[in-house]
Amino acid sequence: LKIANSRGHLIILPWMGQMIWDAQFDGHGLTMCNMFRQPKPATEVIETYGCFAFHSGLLANGCPSAEDTHLLHGEMACAAMDEAWLELDGDMLRLNGRYEYVMGFGHHYLAQPTVVLHKSSTLFDIKMAVTNLASVDMPLQYMCHMNYAYIPNATFSQNIPDEILRLRESVPSHVNPTAQWLAFNQRIMQGEASLSTLSQPEFYDPEIVFFADKLDAYTDQPE
């Protein structure tokens, strides 16, 4: 499904996890370079890893270790949606969806993702609401996973302090680090290098990951 305004468009897969396949605004493609010419039928996101954004989780998240049994980035990424519909509300176009996960003797929840496109704007909203329908607590591990295009010399900014960003020190099993990548990570940990500007692409493959926790202690609305 392609939804558009005067500034650009989104291509969305309403029936597969409400994945956003592509995003283009003001003549700029926002999606990372990848090998996929089009979406592929998939049950795991790695089988169609060319999208701009997807909902990662919900019962489990991230890269499974040897001891884990969950799919890469969880069951929601490629979930077969039960319902999808469009709503027009003033200057907004909203794509809604519903997915009910139920497993005998297991978890039961309702996921309701939403994408909102605004009139004459390059900003759009990605939302997710989750309701536990079981009689017991459920684990919830959610991430809105964005795959942005690499922009040379782009800069990062945020309204949280730099010192709360923590570098991931573990190396997942699917990552094959190079010697220069390991050395660059060590320089970051020692305070000798930073990633405020994307000016050294040779050091960013594999990806470099930072964590931040308890953001509400610093701002009501992290940006």
Q: In which residue ranges do the predicted regions lie?
A:
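Hydrophobic beta-strand positions in extracellular immunoglobulin-like domains
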Residues: 129-130
